[in-house]
């Protein structure tokens, strides 16, 4: 049977089948992405083939579901660790766009991080919208700096929005951007991704955390990647490889916060074609 990977817990995956069933699965076999060895050969957003086998251990019989094949990806976003391991990690696959949540204070998102994310998304043909969050906490000088950053990125062609997920200011205006699309939500730890999702998806109840006073950096509240439906009810149907789904039109992919974003060596054509 075929389905969509909607959750990655590290050692296992949750797959929403085309028939609307939710299955806990593990990977069977080795998968490669164009020769790149990644920490997660299967990513949230992947279209996969699932099979099951019956296992009998000490007179206990259970059905084990395996991911046996990954359909060709139309795109993906991959990051390389900035530590010595240099391992790669696929954030998500088959996305229509990415929202990069950034903050100019508490914590401050560096332009280096933003530019590396944009370069990686550009290489894999993923449109990006920059979401400047926590506008309610900014001083007059910080608001001026934020406006300069917005002008900079709009000048080079990126759409930017300024919001406060905490107060809700500007959040409803994001909904038309998300309608009918699979959207990756990414950013540093502590920039307010979980708060934003809680605003957009009533009942999501994602855990949030305060900023570390000592380092003014965020602390992880999301520990795994997950697709969250923006429309539809409990009975969900996975979008096919053509993107059609009768019950769910819009998805948000929630990912753990990223402290650093390393990029792979890219050819000039990957960024300009």
Model segments located where?
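Canonical P-loop GTPase G-domain recognition
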Residues: 137-191
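Phosphate-binding glycine-rich loops and their immediate beta-loop-alpha structural context
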Residues: 90-97, 101-156
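Structural detector for short beta-strands of small beta-barrel domains
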Residues: 1-10
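Residue-level signature of catalytic and energy-coupling elements of molecular machines
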Residues: 5, 45, 121, 178, ...
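Beta-strand/loop nucleic-acid-binding surfaces
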Residues: 22-40
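SH3/SH3-like beta-barrel fold
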Residues: 13-17, 25, 50, 67
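A conserved segment at the C-terminal end of the G1
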Residues: 193-209
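Helix-rich effector regions associated with P-loop NTPase G domains
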Residues: 11, 37-56, 60-64, 71-91, ...
């Amino acid at each position: 049977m075929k389905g969509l990977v909607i959750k990655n817990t590290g050692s296992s995956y949750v797959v929403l089948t085309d028939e609307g069933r939710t299955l806990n699965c593990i990977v069977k076999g080795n998968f490669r992405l164009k020769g790149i060895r990644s920490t997660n050969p299967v990513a949230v957003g992947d279209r996969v083939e699932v099979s099951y086998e019956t296992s009998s251990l000490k007179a206990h019989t259970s059905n084990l579901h395996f991911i046996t094949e990954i359909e060709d990806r139309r795109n993906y976003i991959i990051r390389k660790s900035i530590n010595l391991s240099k391992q790669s990690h696929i954030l998500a696959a088959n996305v229509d766009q990415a929202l990069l949540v950034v903050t100019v204070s508490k914590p401050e998102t560096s332009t280096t991080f933003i530019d590396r994310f944009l370069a990686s998304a550009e290489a894999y043909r993923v449109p990006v919208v920059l979401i400047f969050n926590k506008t309610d906490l900014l001083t007059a000088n910080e608001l001026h700096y934020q406006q300069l950053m917005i002008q900079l990125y709009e000048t080079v062609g990126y759409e930017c929005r300024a919001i406060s997920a905490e107060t809700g200011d500007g959040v409803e205006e994001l909904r038309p951007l998300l309608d009918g699309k699979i959207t990756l939500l990414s950013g540093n730890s502590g920039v307010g991704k979980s708060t934003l999702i809680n605003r957009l998806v009533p009942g999501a109840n994602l855990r949030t955390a305060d900023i570390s006073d000592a380092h003014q950096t965020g602390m992880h509240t999301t520990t795994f990647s997950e697709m969250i439906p923006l429309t539809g009810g409990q009975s969900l149907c996975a979008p096919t490889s053509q993107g059609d789904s009768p019950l769910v039109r819009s998805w948000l992919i929630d990912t753990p916060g990223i402290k650093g974003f390393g990029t792979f060596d890219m050819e000039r054509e990957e960024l300009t074609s």
